[in-house]
Amino acid sequence: MGQGSGPGVPTTKMEGIGIMDLNILGHRGLTPVSQEMENDMYIIAGLGNPGSEYELTRHNIGFRVIDELAGEYNISVSEKKHKGLIGKGVIEGQKVVLVKPQTFMNLSGECIREVIDYYKEDIEHFIVVYDDISLDVGKLRVRPKGSAGGHNGIKNIIAQLGTDEFARVKFGVGDKPKGSDLVDHVLGRFNKDDEELAKSHFKTAAAAVTCIMNEGCASAMNKYNG
């Protein structure tokens, strides 16, 4: 079964779910970011579903890692644009655009395509963070490219971009219990212990993203792959 809106959520069950302003200050050195940012920036997206009912679900781990980055570097991800929420800022001297698609998981690629086209950035400067049921809770796996692996959000991004050669940080949310429904699992919330475990790794996931920008995927893989 696919992993994306929940992995492989039938459209008959849950349609679409797989289911700032200008002077944002960078955390390091509080560098103002002008309205017209130069090219040479990174677009960092976290995947999830919009709406309070999905806020703390396993499938929204990508959103939560973006929130971690935004909080650490004082970036407001609140501008409604390109079918998503975006925030412009600086992370360790590197200009970035943080993105939380608001299309629901299965259509995440529509938002990503618009953002990349608007900023005219190369795919090499795109990083995506998302949930992975094949990894234990809190475990990370950095990859420079690869298939969707059953994740419908990534599947749509690959379809929209026409390539799977973009960096990603997979965040483990644990596999479903035997005999349970996969959709219910990814659209469900962690138990208390797993929630605390996941939260304790948000900062590490954010660090993996910055490592990809500063040192490349190979270095990030060596440092953060669990």
Region spans (language model):
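Intrinsic disorder/low-complexity segments
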Residues: 1-37
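Nucleotide and nucleotide-moiety/phosphate-recognizing core
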Residues: 21-26, 30, 36-144, 155, ...
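Short glycine/threonine-rich catalytic loop with a Thr-x-Gly-x-Asp
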Residues: 147
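Hydrophobic alpha-helical segments within soluble ligand-binding/sensing domains
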Residues: 150-153
